[in-house]
């Protein structure tokens, strides 16, 4: 519908309506692809991308769902997943919310198994009111299995131990391979034509899903359903479940358990208990199938109002914010580390040790200059002293004496420079260049 000015969408409204359209129209789907960008944060949720040769889609599998997966996904692995398309509104991204995950090989078989189980359940082949009761006094048991397998040995051993009077008729058949389902159908039909036994025990030992696949045949399911003889299905181990288990009148978890179910002990309590338990299991499985269909319908109706979906989106957004926060913290720590290194370098340059080294070098330089300056000053002073000494020597009395003059002083060591200071009889000292002369004034002659 074209928008108008009176019908302007907000981004949130647009994403919300896109989510409702996608979730309402597609419902639950199966998807096959290769895993990439797998991550498993501390919340326990799984986030991944499924891709093929030309396209990819983001997926999320929340903790409550992925705990049922029997393997840890890895990048590059081919898987088959079941889920519902949703829109992560905060980003406007559409994604697949995964409910179950299987390896690609087993996954395709499991998908076919689920599809056939739903189809046959809808047709009423599993209905509890169609199940036949076992005869009260079983005399002959028809065993439909391989005559050379471990299952027939287990069955014969249990029957011989519990009730040797029971007669066993073996209807040999294949129990594995492409033609095994047809072979089993023929054996059941032969037993119904002969009507020589009281009950049929369909059995084989355990194996993989592929090994047991012949017991998941639609044709075999209808053959068991149409059998006039009651059928007990005892295929594989206790964890193995096949279509034949759902259609049969009673399901036993193992071949030995099937033999015990059909044989009586002294008080017959085991048979009664096993029969009641088997019927209870069948009723529970039928009820479970009915409730699964009802639950699927209710889930589809409640998708738009599912608070769990909203919570899951918040959890996914929280995981993304946590990853962004961890990245931001890492970048911040890197920046702080660089800044710390820079400050450490600057602190090293400002440290007393560094300054002392610089000042020590400067002091050595100044000491050298001071030494040179003192040497220059001493040299200049020496030259000055020599010059002054020379000048002093020039005017010194000693210099006068060296030129042939003498100096006369009285007894008081006063220089006599005039006869006015003398009287007859005064003692005089005359200083010559070399030595002194002591004399007495005997005559005074004034200057003419």
UniProtKB/Swiss-Prot annotation:
GO molecular function, a single term: exodeoxyribonuclease VII activity
One annotated GO biological process: DNA catabolic process
E.C. no: 3.1.11.6
Catalysed reactions, as listed in the record: Exonucleolytic cleavage in either 5'- to 3'- or 3'- to 5'-direction to yield nucleoside 5'-phosphates
CDD domains: ExoVII_LU_OBF
Pfam families the UniProt entry points to: Exonuc_VII_L, tRNA_anti_2
Alphabetized UniProt keyword annotations: Cytoplasm, Exonuclease, Hydrolase, Nuclease
Subcellular location: Cytoplasm
HAMAP family with a match to the protein in the record: Exonuc_7_L
Protein family: Belongs to the XseA family.
Assembly information from the UniProt record: Heterooligomer composed of large and small subunits.
Function of the molecule: Bidirectionally degrades single-stranded DNA into large acid-insoluble oligonucleotides, which are then degraded further into small acid-soluble oligonucleotides.
Protein name (record): Exodeoxyribonuclease 7 large subunit
Organism: Shewanella baltica (strain OS223)
